[in-house]
């Protein structure tokens, strides 16, 4: 399965009538492997800062998580495994795998829990596959 198919079929799938706003799979080096059409244009530095937070949990807390034009307040995640952010009625979940980061962005009516489930389910699958 192509990386784009993982984004289209597993991240942008319908959950209880709702979808993520956008999603992507990004390499640890910050290079985007696949993304949905609405995924924000991001800088490599933004992705490498996210990666740094996995290596140094709490790195993003003072400044927030920036992705494209949006700044997310970093909230409780799983150190070294999952980063979660909040912005108004929406937010972001990032799951680290062996080779990539799975990123999901949501807004109401999708809930944080639904976003976490979609992103972490694919991330766990990729980890099981050695990816």
From Swiss-Prot:
A motif (Involved in PIP2 interaction) lies at residues 81-97. GO terms for molecular function: actin monomer binding; proline-rich region binding. One of its GO terms (biological process) is nuclear migration. Phosphorylated by MAP kinases. Pfam families: Profilin. The keyword Disulfide bond applies. Disulfide bonds join 13-115. It comes from the Eukaryota. One of its GO terms (cellular component) is cell cortex. Binds to actin and affects the structure of the cytoskeleton. At high concentrations, profilin prevents the polymerization of actin, whereas it enhances it at low concentrations. Occurs in many kinds of cells as a complex with monomeric actin in a 1:1 ratio. This is Profilin-11. It comes from Zea mays (Maize).
